[in-house]
């Protein structure tokens, strides 16, 4: 897990648009057009907004409402063009920095989609690892959609339904 944590924290990705839909059809969106938005940053790295793109390195920012239970969210993200490999990670149901669910696209030698739950004192568990079926390329945009309903989690890539 330490390797995954470091990869997550070292991940540099640009998020173009984040949209969340909660149980009563409330729609919350963020197109990152407000460069003065105050970000709730977790970690010692940097998070910034410029040119309608959210960028993070060595940290991440929290969005939405932690009290939502049934919701979906989507992100459009990419790794920088000069990155060695693609690593795009997003977390949800964040209780704190250590207790949360994480979904990610990891390229390089392993072109996989990961779904895992991180927990305090090493109670981490992989919930699913699936081959992507393609090789992610740095600089290309990828879309992830996550649906959370009760104890069910569904993950879609690009335009899957």
Which residues does each PLM region occupy?
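Short, solvent-exposed beta-strand-to-loop segments that form ligand-recognition rims
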Residues: 156-161
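Bacterial N-terminal signal peptides
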Residues: 9-17
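Short tryptophan-centered beta-strand motifs in secreted/extracellular beta-sheet-rich domains
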Residues: 32, 73-75, 141-149, 153-155
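Secretory/extracellular carbohydrate-interaction modules
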Residues: 56-121
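Extracellular carbohydrate-recognition regions
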Residues: 23-44
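Sec/Tat signal peptide C-region and signal peptidase I cleavage site
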Residues: 18-22
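Short, aromatic/His-centered strand-loop micro-motif at the edge of beta-sheets
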Residues: 121-143
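Sec-dependent signal peptide recognition
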Residues: 2-10
């Amino acid at each position: 897990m330490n390797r995954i944590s470091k990869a997550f924290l070292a991940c540099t990705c640009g998020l173009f648009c984040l949209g969340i839909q909660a149980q009563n059809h409330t729609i919350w969106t963020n197109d990152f057009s407000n460069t003065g938005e105050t970000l709730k940053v977790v970690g010692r790295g940097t998070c910034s907004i410029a040119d309608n793109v959210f960028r993070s390195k060595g940290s991440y920012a929290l969005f939405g409402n932690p009290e939502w239970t049934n919701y979906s969210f989507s992100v459009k993200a990419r790794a920088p063009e000069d990155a060695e490999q693609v690593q795009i990670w997003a977390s949800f149901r964040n209780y704190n920095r250590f207790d949360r669910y994480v979904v990610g696209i990891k390229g390089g030698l392993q072109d996989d989609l990961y779904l895992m739950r991180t927990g305090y004192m090493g109670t981490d568990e992989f919930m699913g690892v699936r081959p992507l079926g393609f090789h992610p390329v740095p600089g290309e945009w990828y879309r992830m959609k996550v649906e959370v309903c009760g104890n069910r989690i569904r993950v879609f890539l690009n335009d899957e339904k």
